[in-house]
A protein has these predicted regions:
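Short, well-ordered alpha-helical scaffold segments within catalytic/effector domains
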Residues: 42, 72, 145-149
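Phosphate-binding beta-loop-alpha motif at adenosine-nucleotide cofactor sites
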Residues: 58-63, 132-165
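Surface-exposed charge patches
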Residues: 15, 73, 150, 154
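PAPS-dependent sulfotransferase catalytic core
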Residues: 1-68, 74-87, 91-129
């Protein structure tokens, strides 16, 4: 399971893993099965992995699993032995990429990036994004990795987790 910060490289890692002959990665990449307030029936979730029978590893990538409260706990109950890859990125570079992504999708008007960031700092309420509510201003909240990591009950002792810069 690949989780972590949006615009941190999850698509690239998903595509790279999918090229390995012993790894099956879902299509579509982001299933969003566990980041809803009520998860789907397990059978309907498992259907996404049917084509992966016979592979040594089957996986999916939904970055927002780390972001939405309760999701990591639901995943731990579903599969206590689930292997997680948590991707982080420099918060400033990630935020700029997120804003550019929102502009490309026309969720944000094409404006001066620096001006937008200053406006957000003046009106912090724009940055108060609520889980399960899409917002073009999520670039701030979705880049805060410590709260996302602390939501994972298996990361309470992170001494065994390798970190790569």
């Amino acid at each position: 399971m690949i989780v972590g910060a949006m615009k941190a490289g999850t698509s690239t890692l998903h595509a790279t893993l999918a090229q390995h002959p012993e790894i099956f990665m879902t299509k579509p990449k982001e299933l969003h099965a566990w980041d809803m307030p009520t998860p789907p029936p397990v059978d309907s979730y498992h259907m996404h992995f049917e084509r992966g029978r016979g592979f040594a590893i089957r996986g999916e990538s939904t970055p927002s699993y780390a972001y939405h409260p309760g999701t990591m706990e639901r995943l731990a109950r579903y599969n206590p032995g689930l292997k997680l890859i948590f991707i982080m990125r420099d918060p400033v570079k990630r935020a700029i990429s997120h804003i550019n992504h929102s502009v490309r999708l026309r969720r944000l008007p094409e404006k001066d990036l620096f001006g937008e960031l200053l406006a957000d700092q003046r009106d912090m309420s724009r940055l108060d994004v609520k889980p399960f509510r899409p917002s073009p201003y999520g670039y701030h909240a979705r880049g805060l990795c410590p709260p996302q990591i602390s939501r994972n009950p298996r990361l309470s002792d992170a001494s065994h987790i390798p970190l790569q810069p």
